[in-house]
């Protein structure tokens, strides 16, 4: 059966295990936080196979679990440096003493990933390589740190851009079907329609 399971990290980032098709044991993991183990345990306990680990961007709270992950990892290669070098980010996010090192495993270009039921959107702003994933048969979109239910991603970190965020909101987010349910990188879900109506941060970026 189709399902979306949410696992929230101690970093507050959301990891999702998505089983998009009935009568299929193939799942997709959206983002790989440092403590990704519960998501991987869910996959094993339910005898699922991983069709791909799809990263929304390269920040450590969404990618530091790459060493632990099974399955091919896909990312916009504009964020490859961020994903491979988490030590460059930690001081900007947290005072915790996470043990990190450069990731040397394989990273696959997200634009080489092919699935007719999954649309891939490039929405730079939070990072240069930020991506959203729409699972068309489920009526949902995973936005990472692009847009939240009550906010938008910050743009003052490495490769972030305020002007690109504005362009992405107007050209990508406004193109989404208003009935889509948004599953963000942090916080709760909501519909595109509700976010457009009540997210004051996002509304400030919409062209008049």
Residue ranges and their predicted role:
Residues 6-8, 102, 122-124:
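Short Gly/Pro-enriched turn/cap motifs at secondary-structure boundaries
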Residues 1-46, 132-144:
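Conserved beta-strand hairpin/beta-sheet module of binuclear metal-dependent hydrolase folds
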Residues 29-30, 51-59, 73-76, 122-125, ...:
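Active-site neighborhood of phospho(di)ester-bond hydrolases with catalytic His/Asp-centered motifs
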Residues 118-119:
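Conserved N-terminal boundary motif of the eukaryotic protein kinase catalytic domain
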Residues 7, 18, 108-115:
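Short acidic-hydrophobic surface loop/beta-edge motif
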Residues 122-208:
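Metallo-beta-lactamase
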Residues 34-113, 201-204:
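Active-site HxH/HxHxD metal-binding segment of metal-dependent hydrolases
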């Amino acid at each position: 059966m189709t399902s979306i399971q949410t696992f929230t990290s101690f970093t507050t980032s959301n990891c999702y295990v998505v089983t998009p098709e009935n009568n299929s044991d193939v799942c997709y993991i959206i983002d790989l936080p440092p403590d990704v183990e519960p998501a991987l345990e869910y996959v094993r306990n339910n005898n699922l196979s991983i069709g791909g680990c799809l990263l929304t961007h390269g920040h450590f709270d969404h990618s530091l679990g790459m060493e632990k992950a099974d399955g091919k990892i896909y990312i916009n290669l504009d964020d490859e440096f961020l994903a491979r070098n988490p030590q460059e980010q930690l001081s900007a996010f947290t005072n915790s003493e996470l043990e990190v090192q450069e990731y040397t495993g394989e990273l696959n270009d997200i634009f080489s990933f092919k699935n007719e039921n999954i649309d891939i959107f490039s929405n730079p702003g939070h990072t240069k390589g930020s991506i959203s994933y729409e699972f068309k048969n489920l009526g949902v979109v995973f936005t990472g740190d692009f847009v939240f239910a009550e906010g938008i991603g910050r743009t003052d970190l490495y490769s972030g851009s305020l002007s690109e965020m504005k362009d992405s909101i107007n050209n990508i987010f406004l193109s989404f079907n208003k009935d889509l349910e948004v599953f963000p990188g942090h916080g709760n879900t909501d519909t595109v329609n509700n976010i457009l109506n009540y997210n004051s941060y996002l509304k400030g970026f919409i062209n008049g």
